[in-house]
Amino acid sequence: MKDIFEKLAAQENLTEAEITAVAEKIFKGELSEAQIAAFLMALKIKGETPEEILGLVKTIKKNAAVIPSQTSDAMDNCGTGGDKSFSFNISTTCSFVLAAGGIHIAKHGNRSISSKSGSADVLEELGINVVLAPEKLAQVLDETGIVFLFAQKMHPAMRYISPARQALGIPTVMNLIGPLTHPMDLETQLLGLYQADLQDDLAQVLKLLGRKRAVIITGPDNMDEAALYGKNHYTLLDNGQISQGSFTFEDFDMPKVTLEDIKGGDAKENAQILVSVLKNEPSPYLETTLLNAGLGFYANGKVDSIKEGIDLAREVIASGKAYAKLKALQEAQVD
């Protein structure tokens, strides 16, 4: 590791082979927590390249659990986290709306790393078993159109890196690659990113991973979700072509909602918020969900514009289908 640390300290990029070799050492348990933390920090300070990110992603995916699903067009909408916004679980709430709108959702997520409540925490609070066997998870997805894939269960070797991540307590390359290491080969993806200037790099990685269509979104104040109070920046990957765009709440005639308006709490509080949104109870949480679910429908290609996606999300929630999708998962993803 000495050569690697010296190279990173000199602000030199690693080759895919070099970072793959480091990743294999990490995921075999051959490096100490101190070495892993030093590696993550050195990479963060230098700045990660698409090649470095791809090398890590490939190594992690190679060792991931296999989900034997018959679903070939699955989508994920998880974000990187790490934005310190302490908002409610937006992408988790949106996943039920997207699934109710006809998209097969394989939601990849974890426990809280830098927030009060991760997706796994809030779903457990709702009675959903996040540690089922891969075969059962595949059955749930095929039968209900939605499933939650717990990252720790999908990537058991990640246990070697988790203590270092928690000790650091700040976003690292592992936040960036979390949404990229989905165990299934996704067709489409909505990826929330806490740093807008990294969007193009991640779009390049998604392209190399074979995504047909994807949207990477960074909200105001570097949120890893779209928000209704400032400018949102996104990158669209569509059949190999990459383009950028931006929007504000005013573009869609939606109300202004501040970050303070959508603060979440612990898993119990966030579970209550999620249910209230899916029951179509008016609130800033509902409006924020409509925006992000609309963006998800657009990322999937289900609609031709974000505005059409917002309208579809509104219709799906008002019809009761989104809440029904939650009930379906609660009944299916159990012991």
Curated annotation (Swiss-Prot):
It comes from Streptococcus mutans serotype c (strain ATCC 700610 / UA159). Mg(2+) 2 binds at residues 224-225. Anthranilate 2 binds at residue 165. Mg(2+) 1 binds at residues 91, 225. The gene is trpD. Homodimer. This is Anthranilate phosphoribosyltransferase. 5-phospho-alpha-D-ribose 1-diphosphate binds at residues 79, 82-83, 87, 89-92, 107-115, 119. Belongs to the anthranilate phosphoribosyltransferase family. Its EC number is 2.4.2.18.
